[in-house]
From Swiss-Prot:
This is Cryptic plasmid protein C. Residues 142-205 are annotated as: Disordered. InterPro entries: Endonuclease_MobA/VirD2. Plasmid pJD1 is the smallest of the gonococcal plasmids. Its function is unknown. Pfam families: Relaxase. Keywords: Plasmid. Residues 155-174 have a biased composition (Polar residues). The keyword DNA-binding does not apply. Residues 189-205 have a biased composition (Basic residues).
Amino acid sequence: MIVQFFNRGKGGGSGPIDYLLGKDRDREEARLLRGDPEETAALINSSDYAKKYTAGCLSFEESNIPAEQKHALMDSFEECIFAGLDKDQYNCLWVEHRDKGRLELNFVIPNIELLSGKRLQPYYYAADRGRVDAWRTMQNLTHGYSDPDDPAKRQSMTQAKDLPRNTQEAAQSITEHHRRLRSPSPIRQAKKPRRRAGNAGKGRF
């Protein structure tokens, strides 16, 4: 599992809600898990702040997980990013997506503290990244989810998802070329034992 925060948050409430559920609330493989879409949209629309909402997702390599785990994860994640707040102080909408070949638990949070009406910033990269990363690592260990920090899953080259296809292919080709250069050739490997055998009678160690 990975935790992603999207670079969004400006504009009206209809944008994120329509994306998650479809304009007519008929998006395929989308399911409302928690919250009231219309209430969330209304809170976003009522905001006078430049960044009106925070959006992101918990993304899993697993195609599905038990329903009780989903709700436990949502509860735990809210406790992590809303530390010190009660549930009546914030609004958080959760929508499940499964249309990309993986499970995503998407969240949208109006950046408003409900009791005071003051600005709420649930995630600030510089201050909160370490805490959220620690939460993610703990959940992956606890539930056995696929872990992006597993060395076996690290790519030899990190590529931006939005690169043009031909650029991605070129980058992959370069990566494969360098990998071959780093690997000892069969000819060189075959020669090494002969050198040792040739030196064996000369007393060299």
